[in-house]
Amino acid sequence: MKLFSIIIVVVGLSMCSVSAQEGCLNQTNLKALDASWEKAQLELDLDFIESLLAEDFVWVHNHANTIDDKTAVLERIKRYINSNNKSTKSRTSRDVKVIISGTTAIVRGFTIIDRGPRPITYHFMRTYIEDNGKCCLIANHTMAVPEKEKD
């Protein structure tokens, strides 16, 4: 009976270990979460964005012309909602890659944002952390990719 109890404890601990290793920071979840971030910006989903952003969030925009914290991002979304600003027609990500190290992950790729008259392509690099089993976006860096010169 004692051996059976020991086996149960060992199996239980092993399952907890596997479960902890398969937290929110995995390739599939992070790609889906990042796609949800893009969708939330397009749809001005204030609640989702507020819950996703870490308290220490920072967003460095193109050429560091603007650097936002969580409060600034949320205030901008509120302004867009209040003014019914729906100028962004689409946000499409491509070539998304994920790197995971411990409780930190980098998601990078390109987002094509169409606000008219022509879409603009941005390279992005976002840093996600796992905090008490929840994935949070703690940093975002975006840079416009210049259009190729026409021959």
Protein language model annotation of sequence segments:
Residues M1-L25:
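Bacterial Sec-dependent N-terminal signal peptides
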Residues Q21-S51, V58-D151:
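A beta-strand edge to alpha-helix "cap/lid" segment located at domain peripheries
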